[in-house]
Amino acid sequence: MIWLYTGVGVSIGVWIISGVYVFSEIKNTYDRNGVFTSKLLNLWFVMWGFYHLAVILSSLYGLWLIPIDKRFALTGGFVLIVVGIVVLATGMIEFRSLRRSCGQDISRLITTGIYRWSRNPQFIGCLFYLLGIALVGRSGLAFVLIGAAVIVIDLYTTRLEEPYLERLYGEEYRLYRSRVGRWISMRR
């Protein structure tokens, strides 16, 4: 069992250490009103890959097992996973470009489709499928890790992404932000 905790610990450590670097590079990119380089984008995916590995291992082995009915956990978890994947995919499809979806094309602000109800549906989709994975595994540690990621993503959007989008798109973004909530909102 020590190998499991070591693997989860290393994954969390790599996520944190790479996150410090990645978010500082994102800040530098946003300060220049630039776009994500392929290197930065790859590091972003590696960083979150290690995070996902920690959540998946924690869930797969039921670390810090929560006494929830197994049928409820499986059913509810799979529903959350499917909903999360659909929301994530819908957000990506609305961009109509992988480059735009990954921050490499900033030619226009996307406010249509699922973006009428959330300014960050891709993050919401990830949150749902991660919650589903944690629920299926009934892992308390996975839920703690998800809570940490929610804090990180909220800080990222409020401190880095939103000021950048406001500088980039100006009044168009301010109007959009006044109509649509950061996470989930009813259309205003």
Where on the chain are the PLM-derived regions?
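Membrane-anchoring alpha-helices and their flanking helix-loop junctions
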Residues: 1-109, 129-164, 168-188
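Active-site-proximal inter-transmembrane loops
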Residues: 104-126
